[in-house]
């Protein structure tokens, strides 16, 4: 009997595969998909609980991230601007108000708030009326000097559906002044002669009203719906935080690169072009995205605002119809990315053992985005604990059962 036990234990020790090794084998098997004969993938999984790299493949390869670039923008913004940051649009006037007549100009100062709507415009008109203004004898001036005069980002495709990068818009339309004039008239404010021009608001102008939206309000549609306009607006807030006016995209890139250096990856030749991922000039790695996710997780002031904004697998945002079953459903929270030939996914999940993980998967050269998404979904299901026998695991179970049976028989003989 003793010899039998030794033999069983020897066999067991020879073919035992730990749960982690089993998982790694399954992840390895996913990389044998025929799609990788004509495409490539870079990926990394980091065990946040154990604080170590769990799995990686081509993790440092430079790839186009598509909209997972928004993760880089969001994390940088929360780190640089703070979680209480607000987007602001302001209305000023010059001159004096006498007998209900404003003898001066109105200045509309755009702060590139992507959430400005008609309610904000109505509030501006109401506040003018509340000041006793019933007549405007002057100009309406738009101040868009917070950013450089570029309507589109670097490396954007000319035939794509790109948002215009104007700091004073309503619902992506350049209609702010028209809307303000209409609301002023609705509030019985007579404009002697509508004169509209562009210019910089004087430092001594009088503030009429400020309308604002929080960074959390902007992050939700930016991340869950992958809104490019919101992402670029946030990118220019990062740029403006440097104190430069007009803020330039290059200022935003500089801040992002400072954070990359701070997390220890500054020596890598990454290319940062925009904040949304629309640009074909962006080149990042799965390692960079994963390490930024780790950085966010380590800093509650970032993570507590980033995590709720991420799409939830099977529930909302761009992941609403993905991973609708299995252990990844409701578990994976991640940002998606899609451009022609590019499919990406990066975010957080919980493993079967309760460990918190962050990951990045960047598929490149996939002519059918559905293939990239299918691979990512399968990868996440396995990562979250989807069950499937792996060669050797069944034999381990049989050995364990045999060993337990032998122990029971031995106990009975005593």
Ranges and model annotations:
Residues 1-22, 414:
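Bacterial Sec-dependent N-terminal signal peptides
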Residues 51, 65-83, 140, 179-183, ...:
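Active-site SXXK
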Residues 19-49, 53-62, 126-132:
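Beta-lactamase-like hydrolase cores
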Residues 174-307:
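A small/polar active-site loop signature that marks catalytic segments
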Residues 271-274, 278-414:
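C-terminal soluble interaction/assembly domains
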Residues 89-95, 101-184, 213-255, 284:
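Active-site-adjacent helix/loop patches that line small-molecule binding or acyl-intermediate pockets
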Residues 42-46, 54-56, 105-109, 139-143, ...:
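Soluble periplasmic/extracytoplasmic beta-strand elements of cell-envelope proteins
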Residues 38-40, 58-60, 66-69, 84-86, ...:
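Extracytoplasmic
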């Amino acid at each position: 009997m003793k010899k039998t036990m030794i033999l069983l234990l020897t066999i067991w020790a020879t073919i035992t595969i730990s749960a982690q090794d089993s998982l790694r084998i399954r992840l390895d098997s996913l990389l044998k998909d025929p799609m990788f004969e004509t495409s490539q993938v870079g990926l990394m999984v980091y065990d946040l609980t154990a604080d170590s790299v769990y799995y990686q493949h081509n993790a440092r390869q430079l790839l186009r991230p598509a909209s997972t670039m928004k993760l880089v923008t969001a994390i940088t913004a929360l780190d640089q601007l703070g979680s209480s940051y607000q987007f602001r649009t302001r209305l000023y006037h010059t001159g004096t108000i006498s007998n209900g007549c404003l003898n001066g100009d109105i200045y509309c100062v755009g702060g590139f708030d992507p959430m400005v709507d008609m309610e904000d415009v109505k509030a501006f008109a109401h506040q003018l009326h509340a000041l006793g203004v019933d007549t405007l004898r002057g100009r309406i001036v738009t101040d868009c000097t917070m950013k450089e005069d570029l309507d589109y980002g670097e490396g954007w495709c000319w035939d794509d559906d790109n948002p215009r990068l104007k700091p004073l818009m309503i619902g992506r339309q350049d209609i702010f002044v028209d809307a303000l004039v209409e609301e002023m008239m609705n509030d019985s404010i007579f404009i002697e002669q509508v004169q509209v021009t562009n210019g910089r608001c004087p430092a001594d102008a009088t503030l009429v009203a400020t309308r604002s939206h929080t960074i959390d309000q902007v992050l939700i549609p930016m991340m869950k719906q992958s809104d490019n306009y919101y992402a670029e607006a946030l990118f220019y807030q990062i740029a403006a935080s440097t104190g430069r006016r007009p803020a330039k995209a290059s200022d935003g890139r500089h801040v992002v690169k400072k954070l990359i250096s701070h997390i220890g990856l500054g020596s890598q030749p990454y290319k940062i072009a925009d904040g949304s991922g629309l640009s074909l000039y962006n080149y990042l790695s799965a390692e960079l995205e994963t390490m930024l996710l780790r950085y966010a997780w380590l800093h509650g002031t970032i993570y507590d605002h980033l995590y709720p904004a991420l799409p939830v697998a099977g529930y909302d945002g761009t992941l609403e119809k993905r991973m609708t079953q299995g252990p990844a459903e409701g578990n994976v929270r991640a940002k998606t990315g899609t451009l022609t030939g590019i499919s990406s996914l990066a975010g957080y999940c919980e493993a079967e053992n309760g460990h918190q993980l962050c990951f990045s998967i960047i598929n490149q050269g996939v002519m059918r985005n559905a293939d990239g998404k299918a691979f990512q979904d399968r990868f996440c299901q396995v990562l979250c604990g989807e069950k499937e026998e792996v060669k050797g695991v069944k034999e381990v179970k049989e050995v364990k059962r045999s060993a337990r049976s032998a122990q029971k028989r031995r106990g009975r003989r005593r």
